[in-house]
Structure formats: C-alpha cells, structure tokens
C-alpha cells in the first residue's frame, strides 16, 4: 500500500495520543484501573497567543486549538462516540480577539452515547507556561496526566514553601517525547503492513465536532454532533 492509502501521512497530526502521560491513562483505563469511565476533563492552555496573522487564518479557537482536545477525548472514549456538545467562548484580557471574531477563552461540554461526560477548557494565554492536564474519572477511581516541569526540584525557604520550576513554554518542548514516540511508531508502520491506530477519519471527525461546537456557540444550547 502507498503512504496515502494506509493513512501514514496523517499520523503526525495526533501527537497528543503518543504523550507518555496521556497514553498511560489510556493503558490504565483499558486495564480497568478506574472501573467504568464516567468523566473526562481536559485542560489546555497556551503560554501566549500566536500572531495576529496566524489567528486570522486559523479558523478560530475550536478548529485550531480545541480540535486537538476533541481527538484526545475520543481517544479515551473509544467506540463510545460523542453525540452532543455545548460550547462557549469569551474575551476578557485581550479584546482584540473581538475584532477577529475569535476567543481567548473557550469551554466545551460533550456527552457520549452512553453518557460519559467530557469538559474541555482552553485558553490562548497562561502566565505560568504550557498548561496541559488530563483527568479521567471512573466508577472505581481517578487517574491524572499532569504538566511536565523544567525539573522536579522543590524549594523550601523562609519566603516560600514547595516552590517548583515552571512548566514548559513551547509545545515542541512539552510534547518532545510524544513526537519521538510518534516517529518510532511511524517507522514500525513503514516496515510492516499494519495500519496506524488513527488516520484521516479521526481528523475528519474532530473537524465535525469543532463545527458542531461553533453551532452551539451561536445557538447557546447543546447541539447534536453532525457526523
């Protein structure tokens, strides 16, 4: 098969699935460590907004930023697809987003066919670094994939206690290991006849969820996700 027909060219777009912390959540979920999945909470905040020129062509926060979280949420939900979504956005600190008809802050609530809830929180800016966290809550427990810090040192002094280093400030640094795992997986796929775990259809579905989020933003109510 060709690279295109096997969907190998589309693998790189879902690097978050390859993040050691995020993928470990999936492994523990499959092993039944937290029982039945009930709720997914994803926090994704960038250190700073991209350039105005980039924002103008980005398609908006739901198609440019939250779309990655939609894919990650589906990764955890598995075959239990999301069927409805409520989305909202606002601008508080950076009013220039109003002129772009975009948002610096966005939140979405999704629900699967079987009732699993998902809350996604996005921000175009975050003073303490690249904030990337995932929480899976189940009938028997909870597992969390936390932020990656510059180091694991904690400082205690007469001025502060448990002062920690800052989080990563660039997505390539934050997902450095994820990109490496992705390349390793891609190399294995090239040497075999196997197909990737995710492909074009996953990207298409994420776009469909993003479009439904925009519909909800306008209607100010839950919308059925149109696949």
Set out the residue ranges of the language-model regions.
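Single conserved hydrophobic/aromatic residue that forms the stacking wall/gate
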Residues: 1-12
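Basic phosphate/pyrophosphate-binding loop/patch that engages nucleotide-derived ligands
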Residues: 9, 23-37, 137-138
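Short strand-turn motif at the edge of the Rossmann-like AdoMet-binding core
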Residues: 14-16, 44
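A general structural signal for well-ordered alpha-helical segments in protein cores
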Residues: 21-22, 69-70, 180-184, 210
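Residues embedded in well-ordered beta-strands within globular domains across many folds
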Residues: 38-41, 86
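Rossmann-like dinucleotide-binding domain that binds NAD(P)(H)
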Residues: 49-117, 121-128, 201
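NAD(P)-dinucleotide binding in Rossmann-like oxidoreductases
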Residues: 96-98, 113-183, 199
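C-terminal helix-rich "cap/oligomerization" subdomain common to oxidoreductases
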Residues: 113, 186-227
């Amino acid at each position: 098969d060709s690279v295109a027909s096997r969907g190998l060219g589309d693998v790189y777009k879902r690097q978050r699935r390859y993040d050691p912390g995020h993928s470990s959540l999936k492994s523990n979920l499959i092993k039944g460590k937290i029982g039945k999945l009930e709720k997914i909470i994803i926090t994704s905040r960038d250190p700073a907004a991209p350039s105005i020129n980039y924002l103008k062509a980005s398609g908006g926060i739901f198609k440019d930023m939250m779309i990655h979280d939609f894919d990650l949420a589906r990764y955890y939900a598995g075959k239990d697809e999301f069927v409805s979504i409520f989305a909202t956005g606002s601008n508080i600190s950076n009013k220039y987003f109003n002129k772009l008809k975009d948002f610096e802050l966005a939140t979405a609530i999704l629900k699967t066919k079987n009732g699993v809830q998902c809350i996604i929180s996005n921000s175009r800016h975050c003073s303490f670094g690249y904030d990337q966290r995932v929480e899976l809550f189940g009938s028997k427990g909870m597992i969390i994939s936390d932020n990656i810090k510059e180091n694991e040192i904690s400082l205690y002094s007469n001025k502060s206690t448990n002062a920690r280093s800052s989080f990563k400030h660039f997505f390539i640094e934050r997902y450095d290991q994820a990109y490496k795992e992705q390349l390793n997986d891609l190399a294995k796929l090239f040497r075999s006849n196997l197909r990737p775990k995710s492909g074009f259809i996953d990207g298409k579905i994420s776009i469909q969820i993003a479009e439904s989020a925009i519909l909800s933003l306008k209607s100010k109510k839950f919308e059925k996700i149109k696949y």
